[in-house]
Amino acid sequence: MMKLQDFDYQLPQSRIAQSPCAKRDHARMMVLDRRIGSLEHRHFYDFPDFVRKGDVLVINDSKVIPARLSGRKETGSRIELLLLSRYSDSPAVPETDSTEWPFFRVGVEETWEALLKPGKRIRIGTSIFFDDHSRATVIERINEKKWLLTFNTALPFDLFLQRYGKAPLPPYIKREKKNAQMPEDRDRYQTIYARSPGSIAAPTAGFHFSEALFKTLRELEIVIAPVTLHVGFGTFTPIETEDVEDHVMEVESFSISPESSDKINSAERVIAVGTTSTRVLESAADEQGRVHPMSGQSRLFIYPGYRFKRVQALLTNFHLPKSSLFLLACAFAGKDRIQQAYATAIQEEYRFYSYGDCMLII
């Protein structure tokens, strides 16, 4: 059994990026050749130097919704909400083929799973009020962390979120209260190719692509294949088991179109942009490595020992220690290679986590 503690590392707080790079494609990029372990220090605008005709770049086009809300209880005390998924028998996905707002139903109550902070004194029936007199009512406790709430809003729910919701920045982005949310977060905590609303955390490896860089890739005849995985609680929830193998991922909704699967299956090399794209590809691939078009749910947990079926190169950010994302990187490049690369990244003062720099593993 693998011990989770073996995937820990110490990161100085100063290395956690608190804001995005001034220009998307100017982030630093470490290039790791997993065969020989060599490292190269570049910038993301150099990414075209590492691709060639015949490559297919697989991107996750899921769009982050403004899922963080602030309200008050009847006592006047403030409470923070992070919406996780619209409630149904399965994780929330749009009920229409539309990839643009609004994708929520209008004229009916909305029921959502959510995290509440502070959550110690929450009871069934607790009401939470918002600035426009809209209200959410707690109707069920799902488990120690998650609650079920019904919203009655003055506006259609998508417009309510646009007006009052904030970008669901991760908790390690710590700013002074007045700058807790900056105007650019709505734009920068999002990829430029986001199309399908539904994520509550961003597929951050895609942050580094600019329109100019995409133009260069197209000129190089690099094929782009979009897939969708709505990033949910399962991606960022901490692993709490001592043994890695005992961890169970929560389900997340994903889809891959016939057009994208055809592009991927004809690729000479598949480059996955991010761990979420990787999980879509590996969930949709058969044992021969052929990717099939499908829509479904995945709880695929990739950790060292996993045999990759379709991904041949990976672009990813620098991840939290002991996280499922870090374990995926270790599975792809090897635990020792990744730990050595991370130690070098700390020494070379790379920026870590969501708004940080990236690593290309070839």
Swiss-Prot record:
GO terms for cellular component: cytoplasm. Its EC number is 2.4.99.17. Its main location: cytoplasm. Pathway: tRNA modification; tRNA-queuosine biosynthesis. It catalyses: 7-aminomethyl-7-carbaguanosine(34) in tRNA + S-adenosyl-L-methionine = epoxyqueuosine(34) in tRNA + adenine + L-methionine + 2 H(+). The keyword Hydrolase does not apply. It is an enzyme of class 2 (transferase). One of its GO terms (molecular function) is S-adenosylmethionine:tRNA ribosyltransferase-isomerase activity. GO terms for biological process: queuosine biosynthetic process; tRNA wobble guanine modification. Keywords: Cytoplasm, Queuosine biosynthesis, S-adenosyl-L-methionine, Transferase. It is found in: Cytoplasm. Monomer. Belongs to the QueA family. Transfers and isomerizes the ribose moiety from AdoMet to the 7-aminomethyl group of 7-deazaguanine (preQ1-tRNA) to give epoxyqueuosine (oQ-tRNA). This is S-adenosylmethionine:tRNA ribosyltransferase-isomerase. It comes from Syntrophus aciditrophicus (strain SB). The gene is queA.
